[in-house]
Regions:
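A short acidic (Asp/Glu
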Residues: 97-99, 128-131, 186-190, 297-300
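Short, polar loop motifs at secondary-structure junctions
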Residues: 120-127, 182, 186, 292
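E2/UBC-UEV (E2-variant) core
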Residues: 207-222
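GT-A fold catalytic core of metal-dependent nucleotide-sugar glycosyltransferases
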Residues: 157-208
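N-terminal anchoring/stem segment of glycosyltransferases
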Residues: 1-155, 163-170
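Catalytic core and acceptor-binding pocket of nucleotide-sugar-dependent glycosyltransferases
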Residues: 220-314
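A structural signal for short, well-ordered beta-strand segments and their strand-loop junctions
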Residues: 119, 176-179, 239, 286-288
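Structural signal for hydrophobic/aromatic residues that build the beta-strand cores
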Residues: 86, 105, 117, 160, ...
């Protein structure tokens, strides 16, 4: 099922008129109830992945192949009857990545669950026809583009914030924001669900934090001092429950507004603000680089599977400006 609506300035107004606020939304049962009569393997008491870290210092799990039992997870989450919203931005020439993104998502992303894609694009006539599975739908949101890719990046937080407030409070339980210039190569399922979910950036995995490309200028709201920082998170994947993600994108949007008023742009736009947010608001679950790899990279021994990866592209060809 595909539906369309226009994304205009009026969509930003009168947020308080929503029938339900994000904070008031009842998320339903969040208990991890396991049904009776289901046979599964006995968990091991030893570390199943000694080659990588599987927990953070604040005891959030880092999801790797071999660290979970999908039978257990699906038996817990499928009875909750959840809906997962996915925001995708395909502005300008980035619309060319849509077909591979959607077709591969239908093969691998949250298969067996209700999924609603929300596609922001300035080229609705170029949206490809993709067969969607049962319980899965696509809404196309006509959106203004920009002649600067940096501005396109900066506006995403605001657009996700308003989408949650105006459309999703009674329509979804979880939300993921995923970059369109990526492709799914393997299973991505309910093991990725959590209150607030970030992904470890493949380019900085195993790198000391003084080499992270955090925003280092104190004038920016995204500023992180050299002696601080846990991980470097990729902005191509953000997820979690609606209320948690809403708080994240609203906070980042407010910080972006302050920076804009002060005529400063963080080093990596919304990704810089995301890293600042996650430093002081720890994610409850981290996805390993399996969930955000890069097609131009080789496959190291610790990477047992590539689930989602940025595809090769010539940025000068697809971006509206250098």
């Amino acid at each position: 099922m595909i539906s369309y609506f226009s994304y205009t300035s009026s969509w930003f107004r009168d947020v308080w008129e929503c029938r339900l606020t994000v904070e008031e939304k009842k998320h339903g049962n969040t208990d991890l109830i396991f049904p009776t009569g289901i046979a599964c393997a006995q968990p091991s008491v030893s570390n199943s992945r000694p080659d990588v870290s599987t927990t953070t210092p604040w005891l959030a799990p880092i999801v790797w192949e071999g660290t979970y039992d999908l039978t257990v997870i699906d038996n817990i989450y499928k009875q909750q009857n959840i809906t997962v919203a996915v925001t995708v931005f395909a502005l300008g020439k980035y619309v060319r990545f849509l077909k591979d993104f959607l077709e591969s998502a239908e093969q691998h992303f949250m298969v067996g669950y209700r999924v609603h894609y929300y596609l922001f694009t300035d080229r609705p006539d170029e949206v490809p026809t993709v067969t969607l599975g049962e319980g899965r739908q696509l809404t196309v949101i006509k959106t203004e583009t920009s002649n600067r890719w940096q501005e396109i990046s900066l506006r995403r937080m605001e657009r996700i914030e308003k989408l949650i407030e105006k459309e999703l409070t009674d329509k979804a339980d979880y939300i993921f924001s995923l970059d369109v210039d990526c492709k799914f190569y393997a299973h991505w399922g309910a093991e990725s669900l959590g209150d607030l979910v970030g992904v470890l950036h493949a380019g900085f995995f195993g790198t000391s934090r003084e080499h992270f490309t955090y925003e280092r200028r104190p004038e920016s709201q995204a500023f992180i001092p050299l002696q601080e920082g846990d991980y470097y998170y990729g902005g191509a994947v953000i997820g979690g429950r609606l209320d948690k993600v809403h708080k994240l994108v609203k906070t980042c949007r407010m910080q972006l507004d302050v920076d804009r008023a002060n005529h400063i742009e963080a080093a990596w736009q919304e990704e810089s603000h995301l890293n600042k947010y996650f430093l002081y608001n720890k994610p409850s679950k981290l996805l390993s680089p399996e969930y955000l790899w890069d097609d131009t990279k080789g496959k190291p021994s610790y990477l047992k599977v590539v689930r989602f990866s940025q595809v090769f592209k010539k940025y000068a060809e697809v971006r509206p400006n250098p």
